[in-house]
Structure formats: structure tokens, C-alpha cells
Amino acid sequence: MNLKPETLRRIDEVITHYPVKRSAVLMLLHAIQEDIGHLPPEAVQWVAAKLELQPINVQEVVTFYPMFRQHPIGRRHIKVCRTLSCALRGAYGTCATFEKEFSTKRGEVSPDGE
């Protein structure tokens, strides 16, 4: 995996803050996502090896938390609340408007990469 040297140093330093290596999984995932923008499958494998875990244990964390991205995202990231109260006030219509305006679907990157 091609991580910046400062990210690698930060990862090594973060691990020392935890009495059990596996406790550092969230921090490592955050550091990698900050560096490369998302968490590809090789990042999951790399973190698992680094923390002496099974890859499935890391993948569970990646898929559980919505702040982790498994695919590259555009330069701009638009979020629309879709809870019950927001849905009742038209959140899904707002989503449809964004999809039409940017020629994309929810979770995709627009054709211009923005």
C-alpha cells in the first residue's frame, strides 16, 4: 500500500497508545482514509496484518461505520438527512433534485468528478 511516510509514522505511533493492538483499528482506518481518500480492499488487508487480526474483523468495522468510504468519492460530498422528520419535510425530493441536477445517483460520483 502506498501511504505517505508521515501517515506510516502516525500509524506506528498510534498503535503504541493502546494496550491491545486491535483497539487501534478505528484510528488506523481514519488515518488511511485521510491519506488516500477511501478504504480499498488492500487497506483492510494491510490493517489486519498490521494489527494481527483477521481481515473480516477489519471489514466489519469498515462496513459498520458510515463515515468510512470503500470507494473514491468526488471532490464535493453532499449529504441529505433522510430521518423520518426530514423525510416528511421533503428530503427524498431534495435527493431527487440533486440526482437530476448533477446527473448521478445517490452514492455515485458525478461525471465531472466533482
Residue ranges of each PLM-predicted region?
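Signature of N-terminal electron-transfer/Fe-S-associated modules in redox systems
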Residues: M1-E114
